[in-house]
Curated annotation (Swiss-Prot):
UniProt lineage: Viruses, Riboviria, Orthornavirae, Pisuviricota, Pisoniviricetes
Molecular-function GO term, any one: identical protein binding
InterPro entries: Protein_14_SARS-like (IPR035113)
Native species: Severe acute respiratory syndrome coronavirus
Highest taxon, organism lineage: Viruses
UniProt-recorded name of the protein: Uncharacterized protein 14
Length: 70
């Protein structure tokens, strides 16, 4: 999981840079493994929260027919 996520972050940082030198400077912070791990953990947390919200929404959708049925 680390290499694809790292490449994605690298692309995002490089797209914001207008020159090769700026791109290299933007990528330097990404070379620290703790930065990559922190970003991955943040993404996983957001995904977990999103999954919980989706499950709550689905539970409400399932209840709807019983509310409006006979």
């Amino acid at each position: 999981m680390l290499p694809p996520c790292y490449n994605f972050l690298k692309e995002q940082h490089c797209q914001k840079a207008s020159t090769q030198r700026e791109a290299e400077a933007a990528v330097k912070p990404l070379l620290a493994p703790h930065h990559v791990v922190a970003v991955i953990q943040e993404i996983q947390l957001l995904a977990a929260v999103g999954e919980i919200l989706l499950l709550e929404w689905l539970a409400e959708v399932v209840k709807l027919p019983s509310r409006y049925c006979c």
